[in-house]
From Swiss-Prot:
It catalyses: (S)-lactate + NAD(+) = pyruvate + NADH + H(+). NAD(+) binds at residues 31-59, 101, 140. Homotetramer. Pfam families: Ldh_1_C, Ldh_1_N. Substrate binds at R108, N140, R171, T250. The active site is at H195. It is found in: Cytoplasm. Residues 8-22 have a biased composition (Basic and acidic residues). This is L-lactate dehydrogenase. The lineage of its organism: Eukaryota, Metazoa, Chordata, Craniata, Vertebrata. The keyword Hydrolase does not apply. It is an enzyme of class 1 (oxidoreductase). It comes from Petromyzon marinus. Keywords: Cytoplasm, NAD, Oxidoreductase.
Amino acid sequence: MASTKGKLIHEMVPSKERDPPHSKVTIVGVGQVGMAAAISVLLRDLADELALVDVVEDRLKGEMMDLLHGSLFLKTAKIVADKDYSVTAGSRLVVVTAGARQQEGESRLNLVQRNVNIFKFIIPNIVKYSPNCILLVVSNPVDILTYVAWKLSGLPKHRVIGSGCNLDSARFRYLMSERLGVNSASCHGWIIGEHGDSSVPVWSGVNVAGVGLQSLNPDIGTPKDGEDWKSVHKQVVDSAYEVIKLKGYTSWAIGLSVADLAETILKNLRRVHPVSTHCKGQHGVHDDVFLSLPCVLGSEGITDIINQTLKKEEEAQVQKSAETLWNVQKELTF
């Protein structure tokens, strides 16, 4: 006797023969950052399937159920979760947020070896089930872990991307907007280099409507600057530490940043983002490191790097940023 479903629905194409999802996104790690990224991706309708993976089964099941109970209000057809990486099969984009959480006052670089050990398990499993994916690393220290993910995955470097300074630059533009009274979308400024303490503000390129702030204030960003714009960059560097001190972790801003990058990749928008990429040979960098530079993103990952015109002191800061990372990176075991 036919079931209620059988009486209601006449199947034209057997479910086993139907096309797989075309925009499947996997998020590895369902902590605060992972779930902020998940809801940001869902609310922007970027995926036709979302997969969640974590080692903590109860938390994973609870997060999946919570999302599924609200699925009426979303436009993502399928949300799945499992500790087994087979659930991630066929992903176009895999976002890695898993790792040890940064503690109050802890440098991102201090996290490194703990998270390298976690990546030894995660990355091979991702590639096993989604060999054609683009890998977006968010876990900190993101630049070093993007390098580690590249080495462990065997993927071409243009398909291994770190979230890098996309958020740093957003924070920079927000703080500019607060000073100038102009919407942050109209304030243009780039933070490059390490996502962290040695990041580099490109003061020579900061502008509103094409008007360079350095042309109006030649000392901007220097100790001589009477307006102390240098403190804006210090606020960018310190902001994560401040948020962690206040609420214990960062989540919403990085989640929104991940969705911003995911949209550019999945929709092949070819927008320019400051993301972490293999930068040996760029701006006098000689070591095998990943740093944030302005990159063109699309469905293939990073297709181009913009040759940013930097002043000598800015280029020297990028090289110092690279050296900072290399001094930690060369000691890693994986």
